[in-house]
Regions:
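A short beta-loop-alpha structural element at the N-terminal edge
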Residues: 1-9
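Active-site rim helix/loop that mediates acceptor-substrate recognition in acyltransferases
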Residues: 18-49, 53-71
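Short hydrophobic/aromatic beta-strand or adjacent loop that forms the aromatic wall/cage
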Residues: 37, 149-156
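Conserved acyl-donor/pantetheine-binding loop and adjacent beta-alpha core of acyl/acetyltransferases
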Residues: 52-85, 91, 139-150
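Conserved acetyl-CoA-binding loop-helix of GNAT-fold acetyltransferases
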Residues: 86, 92-105
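Conserved GNAT acetyl-CoA-binding A-motif
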Residues: 100, 105-120
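Conserved active-site alpha-helix within GNAT-family acetyltransferase domains
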Residues: 109, 121-147
């Protein structure tokens, strides 16, 4: 992902989430700047088909939704998958699988202990197929969960070395 992709990312995001879950350009840019090697886009001839944003974090501590800034914690031991979204026309084409594979490759390169995410829009069972299990957020992360909505579920899985 590059800064030039953010306008298309925002368009895709608006197709996938209700207004309570939309993030600003500033929020996306903050995460991209914090971890450019773990933010990905899937390109097709017509433009962006989807994106995945992930940032190093502390396991159990998801960042708030639409945070205006992001700094990688010194004690980061997880790669937090913050957002995966596809253009509606790209669903069922393998784009999601390709983006998730890129995420798992980034996990290996960063040598973290956990993969984490917050499941929204009834996606818990989707993420369970990739080995994620419900977990309890801790510290400031517990308070951040309310920014994702009532149905949001924090999930985590250990990374095999």
């Amino acid at each position: 992902m590059r800064a030039e992709d953010i306008a298309s990312v925002l368009e895709i995001q608006s197709c996938c989430y209700d207004e309570t879950k939309l993030e600003s350009e500033q929020s996306f840019l903050a995460k991209l700047r914090a971890s450019p090697t773990s933010c990905f886009v899937a390109l097709v001839p017509d433009g962006l088909a989807g994106y995945l944003v992930a940032v190093p974090a502390e396991a159990g501590s998801p960042p708030p939704l639409n945070g205006p800034s992001y700094s990688v914690p010194l004690t980061a031991n997880a790669l937090y998958l913050h957002d995966l979204a596809l253009h509606p026309a790209a669903r069922g084409t393998g784009v999601a699988v390709a983006l998730i594979e890129a995420y798992f490759q980034a996990l290996k390169q960063l040598k973290v202990q956990f993969a984490c995410l917050t499941a929204v829009n009834d996606s818990k069972s989707f993420w369970e197929r990739y080995g994620f299990r419900a977990a309890v957020p801790t510290g400031s992360g517990a308070g951040h969960m309310e920014t994702y909505g009532e149905e949001a579920r924090y999930m985590s899985t250990p990374v095999n070395a």
